[in-house]
Regions:
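Hydrophobic alpha-helix immediately C-terminal to the catalytic Tyr-X-X-X-Lys motif of short-chain
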Residues: 36, 40-48
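A transmembrane-helix-recognition feature enriched in membrane-embedded lipid enzymes
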Residues: 108-142
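Active-site loop immediately N-terminal to the catalytic Tyr-X3-Lys motif
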Residues: 22-28
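Amphipathic alpha-helical dimer-interface segment in Rossmann-like NAD(P)H-dependent oxidoreductases
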Residues: 1-10, 45-46
């Protein structure tokens, strides 16, 4: 409960996705849900400022070893099953992701982007959204060819 979080100087950790800040083709519903969660966390962080409760949003790229895709359901409500698509070469093993999250919690960070090199894409999107769109489109077309 919020009173307990306040008295213990607790932390709320939300694992969203890098797609919370960057649109990706063919992922419209997923991206919209992640944008919503990011906005909620950003607003809640400000509402809780000064209470001792911190909010950490984790924005990973691909995380391997979760079997998430295999257990997910598609738009028809049926299980998607294993994907034939390969993870990006920048995918992060789930154990490494957990260690990074724990480290960020210990530092009481507000945001953790994994892998860190994705910060460059976020900056590019601020400076030149068209250039960021081109990078994203190219990366997605490479993934779909695999």
């Amino acid at each position: 409960t919020l009173p307990h979080l306040k008295s213990s100087r607790g932390m709320i950790v939300a694992v969203t996705s890098i797609q919370a800040k960057i649109g990706v083709p063919q992922h419209t519903g997923y991206v919209a849900s992640k944008h919503a969660l990011q906005g909620f966390c950003d607003s809640l962080r400000l509402e809780l400022k000064g209470t001792g409760v911190d909010i950490l949003t984790v924005l990973p790229h691909w995380i391997t070893g979760t079997d998430l895709r295999k257990k997910a359901v598609g738009k028809d409500g049926n299980e998607l099953g294993a994907s034939s698509r390969k993870h990006s070469k920048d995918a992060i093993p789930v154990g490494d992701a957990c260690k990074a999250i724990i480290k960020a919690m210990a530092k009481r960070q507000q945001e953790l982007i994994m892998p860190p090199k994705l910060k460059a894409l976020l900056w590019l999107n601020l400076i030149s959204p068209r250039a960021a769109d081109a990078v994203i489109t190219k990366a997605m077309s490479r993934q779909h060819k695999q």
